[in-house]
Amino acid sequence: MPSKLEGAMDALITVFHNYSGSEGDKYKLSKGELKELLNAELTDFLMSQKDPMLVEKIMNDLDSNKDNEVDFNEFVVLVAALTVACNDFFQEQQKKRSK
């Protein structure tokens, strides 16, 4: 049985490949595929944002090689950044509760 971390890694890989390749390179996400992934897999995150250009900004920030596609490495950077932001938020909430 895989560990929780191994399960999380498997989930990242599976989610990425469930959305990549329908519009071109099967190992990369196009802008449309990224938008579909974000809407389906990060619904709560997107609903809490007020910026209608958020997906465009995320794409521009992630697309480090400027090929208008997001590869798996670039995708993992997004997930890591969001995870850090969530962790920071929860730490702040914990600090407020303990005061």
UniProtKB/Swiss-Prot annotation:
Would you say which domain of life the source belongs to? Answer: Eukaryota
MF (Gene Ontology)? calcium ion binding; calcium-dependent protein binding
Classification from the root reads: Eukaryota, Metazoa, Chordata, Craniata, Vertebrata
- What name goes with this protein? Protein S100-Z
Residue positions binding Ca(2+) 2: D63, N65, D67, E69, E74
Which Gene3D superfamilies has this protein been placed in? EF-hand (1.10.238.10)
**What SMART domains does the record point to?**
EFh, S_100
What species is this protein from?
Danio rerio
The answer to whether keyword Magnesium applies is no
